[in-house]
Amino acid sequence: MKIWKDIFTGDEMFSDTYKLKLVDNVMYEVYGKHVSRTLGDVQLDGANPSAEEADEGTDNATESGVDIVLNHRLVETGFADKKQFTTYLKDYMKKLVTRLEENNPSEVEVFKTNINKVMKDLLGRFKDLQFFTGESMDCEGLIAMLEYRDIDGESTPVLLCFKHGLEEEKF
């Protein structure tokens, strides 16, 4: 199993249990689904319910949302406007370029060439995006973007993460 973590915060962002697509060698698209699940619903294999004390029936809480967000404990955040988002992108890209120059100089030119197209595309879709930080809620790290796309007639959540802002870890 592989997990992708934010290079600045160490937060888990997603894993290879989801369908992944690398776009322009700079952006991962992670395809999720909307789920609902019961919290605190513990099933003991082999337990004999008739031999147990009567359950007084507690209200089971449910949570629903995008599986990637729930499973990796991503936290929704936001930007007041497109200008604030643009400022974040510019600052974050500077941090990524600096890190690439130090650790992977051969990737810098590809990154700079392809990221402009991707950023322009993201800014054009700003109103359709939701934004998520990792579990630490550190806004200095990667802020993932989520949008819904019509795939085969279904509304599918797609998480967008900058490839160079992630490190891959194998388990």
Curated annotation (Swiss-Prot):
Residues covered by the TCTP domain: 1-171
One Pfam family matching this protein: TCTP
Localization of this protein: Cytoplasm
Gene Ontology cellular-component terms listed: cytoplasm
InterPro entries: Mss4-like_sf, Mss4/transl-control_tumour, TCTP, Translation_control_tumour_CS, Translational_control_tumour_p
Listed PROSITE patterns: TCTP_1 (PS01002), TCTP_2 (PS01003), TCTP_3 (PS51797)
Keywords noted in UniProt: Calcium, Cytoplasm
Molecular function via GO: calcium ion binding
Free-text function comment from the UniProt entry: Involved in calcium binding and microtubule stabilization.
Family: Belongs to the TCTP family.
Name of the protein: Translationally-controlled tumor protein homolog
Organism whose genome encodes this protein: Aedes aegypti (Yellowfever mosquito)
Taxonomic path: Eukaryota, Metazoa, Ecdysozoa, Arthropoda, Hexapoda
